[in-house]
Amino acid sequence: MGFLKGKKGLIVGVANNKSIAYGIAQSCFNQGATLAFTYLNESLEKRVRPIAQELNSPYVYELDVSKEEHFKSLYNSVKKDLGSLDFIVHSVAFAPKEALEGSLLETSKSAFNTAMEISVYSLIELTNTLKPLLNNGASVLTLSYLGSTKYMAHYNVMGLAKAALESAVRYLAVDLGKHHIRVNALSAGPIRTLASSGIADFRMILKWNEINAPLRKNVSLEEVGNAGMYLLSSLSSGVSGEVHFVDAGYHVMGMGAVEEKDNKATLLWDLHKEQ
C-alpha cells in the first residue's frame, strides 16, 4: 500500500523532468497519489503536459502567479476536477538575470519586488486561494535553498527571497495549524535544473558541494523527491514549520572539509585540485 494512496495533490511550478518538483511528483505518484499540474505559459505547457501524461494525470492548468485572475481560475478548476486536495507543492521562484550578477548592492527596486512577489508572495496567495479545498491533515510544501541563511555566490536577491519564504513557512504553519494543515520547506543541495542554469559558475558550486559535504556527494533528484514525499505524507504528520535539508549534510559545515596530508590538515578542495 502506497503512503499516498487515495490522496490528491497539486504540483505548481514543474518545468521539466530535471526539476525538483518533478522528482517530488514522481515519488508521490509512485506512492499512489493522484496529481494535478500547473504551467506558466504556452511554451512551458509543452513540457508539462508530457510529464502529466507520464504520471497519469489529465489535470493541467495555466497559472502565472503574477496574475490574480489565474488563481481564481485555478481554484474553480481544481474544485471541479478534484473536489479537494491533500497536498500542494509550491516550486516557484524567479529573479531577473541581472539581479543574479554583480553584487546585491546593484539590485534594482524592480528586480527586488519581482523576486519577492514571484518567489514568496505566490506561496501565500496560492495557499490562501486553495485553503477551502485542503482536507484535514493536508500538507503544503515549498522549496528553499541554503542561500537563505548563508552567503552563496551569485545568489544575491534570491537569498533574500528564500529567507522571506522560510519565514512565511513559519507564519503559515501557525495560521493553518488550527485547521490541521501543515506547512514546510525543503532545502535541497545544488542540482542541475532549469532554475540553476541561470546561476553563474554552477558547475564549480556542484563540485565544491560534492567535496565538502559530509557524505562527499551531491544529492540526486530521487533523494530529494523522496524527502518531499515524506513531508507530504502522513509519515511526517507531526512536522510543521520546518526547513528540511536534503543536501548530503552540507548545511552543517562551518569551513571546508579537511583531510590529513603530511601530518597536517589540508583542505579537500586543495587536494582535489592537485590531482
Curated annotation (Swiss-Prot):
Catalysed reactions listed for this entry: a 2,3-saturated acyl-[ACP] + NAD(+) = a (2E)-enoyl-[ACP] + NADH + H(+)
EC category name: oxidoreductase
Site-annotated residues for Involved in acyl-ACP binding: 203
Enzyme active site: 145, 155
Origin: domain of life: Bacteria
Xref: InterPro entries: Enoyl-ACP_Rdtase_NADH (IPR014358), NAD(P)-bd_dom_sf (IPR036291), SDR_fam (IPR002347)
SUPFAM superfamilies xrefs: NAD(P)-binding Rossmann-fold domains
Binding positions for NAD(+) per the UniProt entry: 13, 19-20, 64-65, 92, 162, 191-195
Gene3D superfamilies in UniProt: Enoyl acyl carrier protein reductase, NAD(P)-binding Rossmann-like Domain
Family: Belongs to the short-chain dehydrogenases/reductases (SDR) family. FabI subfamily.
Assembly, per entry: Homotetramer.
PANTHER family in UniProt: ENOYL-[ACYL-CARRIER-PROTEIN] REDUCTASE, ENOYL-[ACYL-CARRIER-PROTEIN] REDUCTASE [NADH], CHLOROPLASTIC
NCBIfam families with a match to the protein in the record: PRK08415.1 (NF006266)
Function: Catalyzes the reduction of a carbon-carbon double bond in an enoyl moiety that is covalently linked to an acyl carrier protein (ACP). Involved in the elongation cycle of fatty acid which are used in the lipid metabolism.
Protein name: Enoyl-[acyl-carrier-protein] reductase [NADH] FabI
Native organism: Helicobacter pylori (strain ATCC 700392 / 26695)
Lineage of producing organism: Bacteria, Pseudomonadati, Campylobacterota, Epsilonproteobacteria, Campylobacterales
Gene name in the database record: fabI
